[in-house]
Amino acid sequence: MEEEFRTIMLNTSAISEVVGNRISFNSATQGAALPYIVLHVIDDQEEHTYQGPDGLSQGRVQVDCYGATYGQAKTLSRHVRGALDGYRGGQFSAIFHASTRDNREGGTNEPERPFTVQLDFLTKWRT
């Protein structure tokens, strides 16, 4: 699931033209140039019938869009939402936008702290 989720964004020109291949899971590559995207699997639950697993899973993926400015992070988040919300294809039967949060990274050097827009997506896919 993770690879295909990332590939959807890499294959969306509005996203890849901004971040290139700087889309990773769990943490950004150290020293990565802004803007970039970090993905987190928040939960992943295999669905069952009384006979056992039914071959479908549902979960939630958090997409963190980082930018040097709020505008850069927000614009990137809009491209991500446009690419993923309502997506159906490949092993995904559905991806839906669930929530958005605007944030700014903590740290001691305020001018260097990136801006972040976090989006949560509910996913349903065939395992």
Where are these predicted regions, by residue range?
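Acidic-leaning, charged glycine-interspersed low-complexity segments
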Residues: 82-127
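A broad, low-specificity signal marking well-ordered, structured residues that form hydrophobic/aromatic
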Residues: 37, 61, 119
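Low-complexity, flexible helical/coil segments
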Residues: 58, 71-79, 98-101
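Small/polar-rich, solvent-exposed N-terminal microdomains that initiate assembly or binding
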Residues: 1-53, 71, 75, 82, ...
